[in-house]
């Protein structure tokens, strides 16, 4: 469906309406910081890389030399949590096959839970019936040690629909761990506290890497080579991330947001963190940069159409995006022109960077942006007509696209290497069930934390308000029930990811990685809009190296 056709020969009905009052977002917390950030000298970095390479081979030999299933499971989970696993994909895949073909369904709940967690996380469809062995004659879970409870708790969050035993395991372990928490000592106390806040499976990989290093350092069973390698790897990744932040900040500064688009959230560092959480391994540098630029554009579009432009200007912008041509700039009010031209210029640069063999991917990216803006215009119509969709299903027909989930996934795959094919790009754009479940999860998570804030201004009705009207609930009641729907979305995403066998594992893995970043950014507050809440975390991730 094309955007409404406009002309430039004067105002039409609605053009003279007063410009909306934009909400006041706090200014950037970072400014030019990463433009002048001083990295270690080349000699220092070379020394770090040389030592890291020695340690990398030591750890590789540990993996190859591991034979017992308990040893293999513990080692791989440790490497995953420290973000070292990407160094050893082939070796780990060989060991996963050993673990999968083993028969561990008996007495050791800790091992059974960790084996289940590891295999399901890595795409193996293992049965949850194994946990029935740990119930008594009345169907209740048997009380066990805290470490086993924690392992069961983390395993249970990889549940899919119909796995009642895992639903029950979450209720049981949550209650037990909460009761025991105040009596625990370090380091398991920190582990339990972190898990109760965010189960292991749902944690953002870069944050888990940062947070787990000090916990692993306190572990009596820690391996000194693994620990040293984890610290060096973190610091080397920090150098890479900081250089990418410098590139993204330079690109963002050229748009002169503070003068041309002062009503927009100036959050380029926060965007980078959010998007890099979905593909944080070093080989995905191009994806991270493309993602950061795309979501910066989404932010501009969202803040312009939702909070600043009047309805006529919004339709002008929608028409220009639909045309995707420099000549369409004549449609736009003055304050939109530079942004629009920069949008076209940036997409042209994507095509040049990808080269003749991969530039076809940018076509899908353009189509995803156009689709996003089309759905924005439908929401603007809802807002202007004070229309409330009758059901959540009706709302989601529009809003699961307008939240940008499809565009984010498309952006991630555009920048990846040869593993991404035309078939994968078409799958992302085809309304696939996994993509749809992800979009619903993003939309509901966003609306739970943003609805109350947005009531201060006239906004399109959210899924929360729609659900309130549909089921005659208060806002708090609706939010609680929608939280249950987000849990349902997790089950769908895991289920659909396990079933997606015709594509490389990186496809479902990327979707789930982005779900983790969404979960973090919208847990309890909108950390993107109110980014003071994550300033210290970002400093520890991108500025302060880990002490060796």
From Swiss-Prot:
Top-rank taxon: Eukaryota
Q: Which GO terms describe its cellular component?
A: cytoplasm
* Tissue note: Expressed in roots. Not detected in leaves, unless damaged by herbivory or infected by fungi.
Cofactor note, please? Binds 3 Mg(2+) or Mn(2+) ions per subunit.
Q: Name one Pfam family in it.
A: Terpene_synth
Q: What is known of its domains?
A: The Asp-Asp-Xaa-Xaa-Asp/Glu (DDXXD/E) motif is important for the catalytic activity, presumably through binding to Mg(2+).
Tell me what this protein is called: (S)-beta-macrocarpene synthase
Q: Which gene encodes it?
A: TPS11
């Amino acid at each position: 469906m094309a955007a409404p056709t406009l002309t430039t020969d004067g105002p039409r009905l609605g053009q003279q309406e007063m410009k909306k009052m934009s909400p006041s977002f706090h200014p950037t917390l970072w400014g030019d910081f990463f433009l002048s950030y001083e990295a270690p000298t080349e000699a220092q970095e070379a020394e770090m890389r040389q030592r890291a390479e020695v340690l990398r081979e030591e750890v590789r030999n540990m993996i190859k030399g591991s034979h017992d299933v308990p040893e293999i499971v513990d080692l791989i989970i440790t490497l995953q949590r420290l973000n070292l696993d990407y160094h050893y994909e082939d070796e780990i895949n060989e060991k996963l096959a050993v673990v999968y073909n083993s028969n561990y369904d008996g007495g050791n709940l800790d091992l059974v839970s960790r084996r289940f967690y590891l295999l399901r996380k890595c795409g193996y469809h293992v049965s949850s019936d194994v946990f029935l062995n740990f119930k008594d004659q009345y169907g209740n879970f048997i009380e066990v040690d805290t470490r086993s409870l924690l392992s069961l708790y983390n395993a249970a969050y990889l549940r899919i629909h119909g796995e009642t035993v895992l639903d029950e395991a979450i209720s049981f372990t949550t209650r037990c761990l909460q009761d025991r928490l105040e009596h625990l000592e370090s380091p398991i106390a920190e582990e339990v506290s972190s898990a109760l806040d965010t189960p292991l499976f749902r944690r953002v990989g870069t944050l888990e890497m940062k947070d787990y290093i000090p916990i692993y350092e306190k572990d009596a069973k820690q391996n000194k080579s693994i620990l040293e390698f984890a610290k060096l790897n973190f610091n080397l990744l920090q150098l890479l991330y900081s250089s990418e932040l410098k590139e993204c900040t330079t690109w963002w500064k050229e748009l002169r947001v503070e003068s041309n688009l002062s009503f927009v959230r100036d959050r380029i560092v926060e965007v980078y963190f959010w998007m890099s959480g979905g593909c944080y391994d070093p080989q995905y540098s191009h994806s991270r940069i493309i993602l950061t630029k795309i979501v910066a554009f989404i932010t501009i579009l969202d803040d312009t159409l939702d909070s600043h432009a009047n309805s006529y200007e919004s339709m002008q912008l929608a028409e220009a995006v639909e045309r995707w041509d420099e000549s369409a700039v004549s449609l736009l009010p003055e304050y939109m022109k530079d942004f629009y031209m920069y949008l076209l210029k940036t997409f042209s640069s994507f095509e040049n960077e990808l080269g003749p063999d991969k530039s076809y991917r940018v076509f899908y990216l353009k189509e995803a942006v156009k689709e996003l803006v089309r759905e924005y215009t439908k929401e603007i119509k809802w807002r202007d007509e004070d229309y409330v969709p009758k059901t959540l299903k009706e709302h989601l027909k529009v809003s699961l696209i307008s939240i940008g989930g499809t565009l984010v996934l498309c952006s991630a795959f555009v920048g990846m290497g040869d593993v991404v094919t035309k078939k994968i790009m078409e799958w992302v754009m085809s309304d696939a069930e996994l993509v749809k479940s992800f979009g619903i999860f993003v939309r509901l998570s966003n609306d739970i934390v943003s609805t109350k804030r947005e009531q201060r201004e006239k906004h399109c009705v959210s899924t929360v308000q729609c659900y309130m009207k549909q089921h005659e609930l208060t806002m708090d009641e609706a939010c609680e029930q929608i939280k249950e729907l987000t849990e349902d979305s997790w089950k769908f995403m895991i289920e659909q990811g396990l079933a997606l066998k015709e594509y490389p594992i990186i496809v479902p893995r990327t979707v789930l990685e982005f779900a983790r970043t969404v979960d973090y950014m919208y847990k309890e507050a909108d950390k993107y809009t109110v980014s003071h809440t994550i300033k210290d975390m970002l400093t520890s991730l991108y500025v302060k190296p880990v002490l060796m």
